[in-house]
Every structure is written in structure tokens, then in C-alpha cells.
């Protein structure tokens, strides 16, 4: 609906509507495609992150839900080609809401032969699911002497698969102390279209490397895990956009109340260290950061001769910059060869 102080022609109203929608599409694609989006999902690592697994195959299925809110503010001023003396000024205020529901399927294998005294593991993360984004925008401005205000809304939904991410990790155990190094890559074969508002694929390759530590006291049942890493993003060939280098830390502390049941707290921080580059980076460096905290609960149980686990954790995000924020929840089920740890002394 257009609201103007005068009664401009229908042709002018149509032009204003097109300008608003074009601006929404331009800004929406930037926000959902590259700016504020990252290959690494903060909160990926949590309980017992660095404890070596037992040799053999394992499998996990994680349900991930996120409700994110963001905003955008753009101001432009230009002349029209056919009317060089007429200046068009537009101020766009947009509210962006995104809902994401993913199933992350992860087959894994831990090798029995030690390497440098540690256990080598391979994981393949496969995300499938749906995402929906809605953008509500209000454009205000003036076309020459005529002021206008125009409100429009667009939305997009996608049900598909994202980029698979293979990972190699090496883990060591030294009593209560456990250590890990890992390397994970993003393979850009997920569903991606640079002209869509929402995508599950990134459209570019990524490489993340990091290390982790887990302290587990079998007597007290106290456990603490921290994992930190750096992400290098390759250039998106579709948009000539390259995200900057990201640094992330996942934190978790828990207490086993019984041999099987634990409660705890989780958190993460994500910081972009270098700015975005390329001809597609029309918003400039667009350095993003965010932090989060939340609760965690988990339960271990036998599945035949295997070890099953069920965990639930949630994150409330804050201190967001150039990135949508909100709540996200992880519900994970896994089955693996029986581990010697954790065993809580009672």
C-alpha cells in the first residue's frame, strides 16, 4: 500500500513499488546469501567434545531449529536517466525473519590403529531440511518534489539439502585431560541460487581448522569442553563475494548427576577477523560477530552392545553485529561403540 501526501499518477505509484521491491531483493539477497552468513555453525561442539571414541562405526542425527530476526537500513540517492534533473532519494528500513529446521545426519568412523598416540576419526556432516525467510520493508523518500512512503513484503521458502562437510579429527586421552585437533571442509554442492533470498548451500568452498580440550573428572562427574577454530572462505564464483576469516569458540560445562544423566551450560562466541571482499561485497567489509549462552541436558543409555546418547541444548544469542540473532536449539541422538568414558565413580 502506498501512502503519499499528494495524489500522484498510477504510473508513479507503480514505479515507487518497483523501486521498493528492487531494493528489498537487493538487500535481502545480500543478507541471506553472503553478508552475515557463515559456513561454521556456532554451537556445533558441546559435551565431551575432545574425548576419543571407541574404534568402529557410529552415527548421529541432530535436529537443529533456529528463529532469527534481523534488520537492515539502506539510503540511496540517484537521478533518473530520462529525467536528469529529477533526484530520487529512498530510505529503506527492513525487518528480516528467518526460520530454519534442519536434520544433520552424521556417519562417523574411528580407526583402531593409533596415530601419534591418538585416535583418528572421520565424520561426514550432511544437512537436509527447510528454511523460510520473510522481509517486511518500508521505503520512504522523494521523487523530485513528491514525497512517498511504500510498504512491501516478500518471502521465500526452500526444502532441500545443504553443503556436506567432511571432517578429520585426532584425539588424545591423558587421564582426566583430553585433546583434539580437527580439520573440516565445506563442499559447495548444496542447493544454492544467487537470485534466491534463502539458500541451504553456501555457494562456495570453506575450510575450518581448530583444536579442542575436554576435562572429565570421573570421581566428581564434572566435565568441561572448549573448542576453537578458524574458517577460511573461498570466493563465491556466482557473486564474486569472499567472506572474511572467522574465529569461533564453543564452550560447555556439565555435571553428571548419575552415571547416565547430566546437566550443564553451553555458550559460544563467533567473530569475523577480516572483512568481506570482492566486487559483490557492496556492503563493504561487513564484519559480523555474535555470542550466545544457554542450558544443556543429556542422557546416556545402552543400545544392545552400543552406547546411545540423547542431548538437548539451546542458545540465546546476544551482542550481534551484522548478523541475524535469536534462539537456536539442538536435539541430538547418537549411537556409537561402547566407550570406557565417561564413567562416574559412585
Regions picked out by a protein language model, each given a short descriptive name:
Residues 65-69, 126-132, 163, 172, ...:
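Transmembrane beta-strands of outer-membrane beta-barrel pores
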Residues 178-184, 191-281, 292:
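Detector for outer-membrane/organellar transmembrane beta-barrel domains
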Residues 78-81, 236-346:
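Outer membrane beta-barrel transmembrane domains
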Residues 33-35, 48-56, 68-72, 111-121, ...:
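Short loop/turn motifs that connect adjacent beta-strands in outer-membrane beta-barrel proteins
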Residues 38-39, 44-162, 173, 341:
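A subset of solvent-exposed loop/turn segments in beta-rich extracellular surface proteins, enriched
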Residues 59-63, 122-126, 168, 181-183, ...:
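Membrane-embedded beta-strand positions of outer-membrane beta-barrel proteins
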Residues 46, 89-95, 149-155, 193-199, ...:
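Extracellular loop and loop/strand-boundary signature of outer-membrane beta-barrel proteins
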Residues 55, 97-105, 137, 158-164, ...:
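Residues that define the transmembrane beta-barrel architecture of outer-membrane proteins
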